[in-house]
Amino acid sequence: MIRRREFVGMAAASLATAAWPGLPVHRLIVAPYLFIPMDDAQSEHLKAYGVAYRALQRGERVEWLINYRGGAFLLPGSAAAARDAALSGVTAQPVDDGTVTAAKAEIAQGNMDAVPLEKAPRVAVYAPPTAAPWDDAVTMALNYAGVKFDKIWDAEVQGGRLADFDWLHLHHEDFTGQYSKFVLNYAGAPWLTDMISQNQAMARSLGFANVPADKRAIAQRIAGFVERGGFLFAMCTATETLDLALASDGVDIAAAYADGTPMDPAASQKMHWDQALAFENARLEQSPTIAVFSDIDGHQVNSPDRRQPLGSFTLFNFSAKIDPVASMLVQNHRQVIPDFYGLTTSFTRRTLKPSVTVLADEPGAPWVKYIHGERGQGTWTFYGGHDPEDPQHQIGDAPTDLSVHPHSPGYRLILNNVLFPAAKKKELKT
């Protein structure tokens, strides 16, 4: 019978041989470093992020090798790291000092960099207590990779809990307080009835007259979290509606079913775009029956006459040594990725603030997919769409099984965002 310890050692040797077949097996068990490739040699791209994250949790030094072997990771050659990689099915290779020195010499000569990661970020996901684990792609990615997180919602945000975290994720929350504008088209559906009841009860418990007022206050708290140095990552509806909520202070942008009064017909002209993170000069959707919020979204998936077909988006190349943050956010083993729908699928170029960094777009299209920027001492990153491996995303679809998509380039972008707050800030020479 093979003991567990022997199995782990055999697994580590096998995986390392797959990473670099020429290395003798007797050198694979003990070495100063553990190298995790992130190119096509990797057998489990998504779980590799979890291995790096847990090494940081143990207080180990991790380096992110930007633009080298698909954005590889270099860990100490500890027994804990080797065991974790083996049990996670992650391709990992013990390497010696000479191998690392040669790799870093190559990195120094090209558009690459070795970025030290200092500590595991404290992660929070903003979601209702009753949200299922498969309700958003980030929750699924975190669970699959083995990254621990806390779930928080309005009461925790209003209670100051954001200060306990470094990184916050938002997904399909509608910060305009209109229940994703599903009310008229899905009236009577049990899931919608529960959503409305839960949100109304929360708003009342926090002293707000209605859900739109509650969500606007939550959006302002989240913006304050970023200003004080927090890292915000949002997808799908949360991207667009967060900015609409921030820019609509004193402006009624909600339908009557949400706050008892109709939307101000002149709302688009009254918005305070200086308060928004990413967008400006958007035109709001006036119809309460169309599940579209504004022309920020380029694909308009729920507007029959404006809906755009899916294509693919291309990740931009950045200077790893000069622009390490943008470079970290686009690390991947693929540069062109199939697009996927969400209530907010993409971001029109026309509505982007000049300060926004575009990380990925559909070449030649009037929209982009993946953007980044700063607010105060912190940063935000917006990624359009709901689930990279569920391109059409219909209500009631079965949850995505990430074990079927361990190499998903779309999901890798999510996990890049989880790790980049751990990076040691580098002073640039001027």
Model feature map: region roles:
Residues 27, 33-34, 39, 43, ...:
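Helical hinge/lid and interdomain linker segments adjacent to catalytic or ligand-binding clefts
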Residues 25-136, 145:
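Hydrophobic targeting/anchoring helices
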Residues 6-22:
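N-terminal export signals
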Residues 181-317:
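A glycine-rich, often tryptophan-bearing local segment used as a flexible ligand/cofactor-contacting loop or short
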Residues 25-37, 44-74, 252, 351-430:
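Extracellular ligand-binding/catalytic regions of CAZymes and related secreted enzymes
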Residues 109-113, 167, 206-209, 421:
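Extracytoplasmic/secretory-pathway proteins
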